[in-house]
Amino acid sequence: MSAFHIRTAQAHDMDYIIGLLAEAGWNPGLHDAQCFFASDPQGFLIAHLGEQAIGCVSAVRYPDVSATDFGFIGCYIMQPPWRGQIYGAWLGMHAMKLLHDCNIGIDGVVEQQTHYAHFGFSMAHRNLRYMGDCSTWPTDQSGLDIVNARTLPLAQLVAFDSQYFPAPRPAFLQAWLSPDTHHSLALMQDGQIIAYGTARACIRGYKIGPLFAQDSNSARAILLQLAAWIRQQTQTSSAPGASEVMLDISEENAQALALVQRLDMQFVFETARMYSQARPALNWQHIYGISSFELG
């Protein structure tokens, strides 16, 4: 019988992991392999039976010098022939062991939430995926001071982002800003960031996340300007769903729900945000879109 083992993924292994996400219908971003790996090069695991890879999981650590490190488990997929067997449980437990000293977050699918509760995770709220065709959205007429986020000092963006994520994540943000298939915007007021968001090209359409804003008008302005950029990228495309936009909101933010409804976006999917320790003290009223189901 082939020996089961788990190894840390290398950069070249990320194509296998992203491939599993794509096969599972998760619609990963075109540059998710590079961006995810940059977040924590020790945080991606591949399960093997002998020489054969059979599944993957991420256990990404976000160090925090002022508090308990935050960790996030995602990308948890076993290939179909090995689902429902002990190997998936071993892989999940290994990920939790790597983050044993962290407050761990997950986005659990509905059918697995009871299972995750058995491992000590408690539900905080639902995250809701909404999807819409941005080709019909209005243009932003706000006149607000919106700039390309790449022009800002990374430290300034990290400081703003850290208000809405449980730990600073400079490596993630630096990678998230870089690809040409990503577009990040920040809304400025008196030299300070009061909103920012990123759109990234995916296998089908675009995902927007994060989208953090101090009020709904700022969130709407960023969202509409990101949509305008998407329309520019897709105006000559005949690919199905080229102008589809996905935004993952929290049920905690009623204004985010109102925003997607005004744009006629449709609910398509949900997860439960769960934590292994206390729920982080985040202002979800300012979180109009989470970054990703895979990394938090």
Question: What do the predicted segments below correspond to?
Answer:
Residues C56-S58, T114-Y116, Q255:
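Phosphate- and divalent-cation-binding pockets in alpha/beta enzyme and binding domains
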Residues P80-T151:
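Contiguous mid-protein beta-loop-alpha structural module that forms a pocket-lining wall or clamp
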